[in-house]
Amino acid sequence: RISNLYQSIYNGNPWLEVNLADTLKNVTAEQAYKKANPNLNTIWEIVNHLIQWRRNFLLRMQGETIVTPDHNYFVPVLDPSEAAWEQSLQTLAKSQDSWTAFFENFNDEDLAKIYVNNGHTYYEHIHGIIQHDVYHLGQIVILKKLV
C-alpha cells in the first residue's frame, strides 16, 4: 500500500489531484531555471533537490549511513539547456524506478528497523520522503504559476 501511495504522488492519481510527472510535463528549461524571486529556489533546483533526497533516503533504507551536505542538496543549476533539463527529469523518473524496485523486495517487518544515524524507523523514513515530495510538489505548483 505504501508503495502505491508513493507511486501515485509521482505519476498516479493521488488525493491531492496533482502529481510530479504531470506537473513537470510541460515545464521548459527556461521556466525551470527562472527565479520567481531572488530568495526562492527554482523549479529545477527543487527537482534536483528531490532527486538527491530520494537517493539519500533509498540508500538509508538499504542500510547505508549517509551524511547530508550543508547545502542540503540545493545547488545552482550550471547548465540551463533543454538537454540538461530533460536529463534532470529523466533522473527523477529513474529515482522513481529505483524506489519501485526497492518496494518490490521490501519486507513489511523491516518497517520497524531503526536507522542508526537519527533513531527513526524505516516506516518514518518512507513516510518522510513521501511528505517531502508532496511538500516540494506544492512549491513547484506555485512556482509554475509565477514563472
PLM regions with names:
Residues 3-17, 21-24, 29-74, 114-147:
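Short, contiguous alpha-helical
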Residues 78-113, 124:
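Acidic/histidine-rich alpha-helical segments that form the ligand environment
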